[in-house]
Amino acid sequence: MKDLSSYKRVILGRNITLTAGAVYALTRATYYATVNPDAVSPAQGVITGDGRLLGGWAAIWLVAAVLCIVDMINRHTRFGLSMVVGLAFGWGAAYAIIWVCTGFTDQSLLSTAIGWVTPAGLVFGFLIKVTALQDMVRNKGGEGS
């Protein structure tokens, strides 16, 4: 790694993160596109309108995957990962709201909410760091640095 310039390390880190974001979003899109509406959990039923909105959720997650790939091509990080973070945080918040509205009784809802929000927070923190590093490297002198 020492042989790589700071610019190349930033690009490598960005592309690894964007690839992971694209794969994650693509798996979500595939799940929502293929799951039987009768097989969703009660909480997923609330979020997906009893399965009627599964196709819409599949399309939204697919857009997030495409934006991650476009970000790699365009050499920035902001759009795809921001959408992945927003979607994951939204799903986590929805599970937390359902947990509250059902009287704090189903701990699996809380666990699922945490399972969505925690990775969203980690990716958000990484997104802030990578975009700051990109800006610093660009201001320092770009590819030759």
Predicted regions and their residues:
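Cytosolic juxtamembrane helix and N-cap/initiation of the first transmembrane helix
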Residues: M1-L26
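A loop-to-helix transmembrane entry motif
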Residues: T17, P42-V63
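Short juxtamembrane and helix-loop transition motifs at transmembrane-helix boundaries
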Residues: D38-D50, V70-R78
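Alpha-helical transmembrane segments of polytopic membrane proteins
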Residues: G51-W61, S108-A120
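Hydrophobic, membrane-inserted alpha-helices
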Residues: W61-C68, W91-Y95
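Loop-to-transmembrane helix junctions at the membrane interface
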Residues: C68-G90
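Membrane-helix boundary connector in multi-pass membrane proteins
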Residues: F89-I114
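Membrane-water interface at the C-terminal end of transmembrane alpha helices
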Residues: V117-S145
